């Protein structure tokens, strides 16, 4: 895939179906727990520091943010789940917004579910992964923050995540460091198979 990383922009921040952009391009959604590093992942994949706003404070992304990647595909940054300080009403609102997008959006071809390599997946991670599998939505699990784990222990942590999510053979998982941009090309190659 030959992407001009200077030609990337945020099209819209949407909260309902009527606001989704009509581009006809393939969409890749990024899902994960609050503060798992979705925005940092987007920025590192497109070689920008601040295209997707990052925050130390969980729960900052509250809309579906559609990023046009060089007129070739759209990254959709989805609100993080599992943040305890968000009210129950707000969590339900996010849940409905995400469910509507994931189950009804024809342009959606792949979901990248991010999990923190340092920790065992939460029940929310397991629920989201099972939800995606239930609807037969192609999913790539990215284990973020690989640089925070000693190199010799990475495979052990990946196995723990595979076991908790009950990944089967043929399910896809890649560990990644946004600092080192490790395996960036492997991830782009995977995404390209859905475009």
Swiss-Prot record:
Pfam families: MMR_HSR1 (PF01926)
InterPro entries, alphabetized: G_ENGB_dom (IPR030393), GTP-bd (IPR006073), GTP-bd_ribosome_bio_YsxC (IPR019987), P-loop_NTPase (IPR027417), Small_GTP-bd (IPR005225)
GO molecular function, one term: metal ion binding
Binding site for GTP: 32-39, 59-63, 77-80, 144-147, 176-178
Keyword Cell cycle included in the entry's annotation: yes
Cofactor(s) needed for function: Mg(2+)
Annotated EngB-type G domain residues: 24-195
Residues reported to bind Mg(2+): 39, 61
Keywords associated with the record: Cell cycle, Cell division, GTP-binding, Magnesium, Metal-binding, Nucleotide-binding, Septation
GO terms (BP aspect): division septum assembly
Cellular component aspect of the GO annotation: cytosol
Top-level taxon of the source organism: Bacteria
Claim: Metal-binding is one of the keywords in the record: yes
Family named by the database record: Belongs to the TRAFAC class TrmE-Era-EngA-EngB-Septin-like GTPase superfamily. EngB GTPase family.
Function: Necessary for normal cell division and for the maintenance of normal septation.
Name by which UniProt lists this protein: Probable GTP-binding protein EngB
Origin species: Staphylococcus epidermidis (strain ATCC 35984 / DSM 28319 / BCRC 17069 / CCUG 31568 / BM 3577 / RP62A)
Name of the gene this protein is made from: engB
């Amino acid at each position: 895939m030959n992407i001009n990383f200077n030609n990337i922009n945020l099209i819209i921040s949407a909260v309902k179906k009527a606001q989704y952009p009509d581009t006809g391009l393939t969409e890749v959604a990024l899902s994960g727990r609050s503060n798992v590093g979705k925005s940092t992942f987007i920025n590192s994949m497109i070689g920008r520091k601040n295209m997707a706003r990052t925050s130390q404070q969980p729960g900052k992304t509250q809309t579906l943010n559609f990023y046009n990647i060089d007129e070739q595909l759209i990254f959709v940054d989805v609100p993080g789940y599992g943040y305890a300080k968000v009210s129950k009403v707000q969590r339900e609102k996010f849940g409905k917004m995400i469910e509507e997008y994931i189950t009804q959006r024809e342009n959606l071809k792949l979901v990248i579910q991010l999990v923190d390599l340092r920790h065992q997946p939460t029940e929310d991670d397991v629920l989201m992964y099972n939800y995606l599998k239930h609807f037969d939505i192609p999913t790539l699990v990215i284990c973020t923050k690989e640089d925070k784990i000693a190199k010799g222990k990475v495979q052990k942590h990946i196995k723990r995540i595979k076991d908790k999510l009950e990944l089967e053979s043929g399910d896809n998982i890649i560990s990644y460091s946004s600092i080192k941009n490790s395996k960036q090309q492997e991830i782009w190659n995977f995404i390209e198979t859905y475009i």
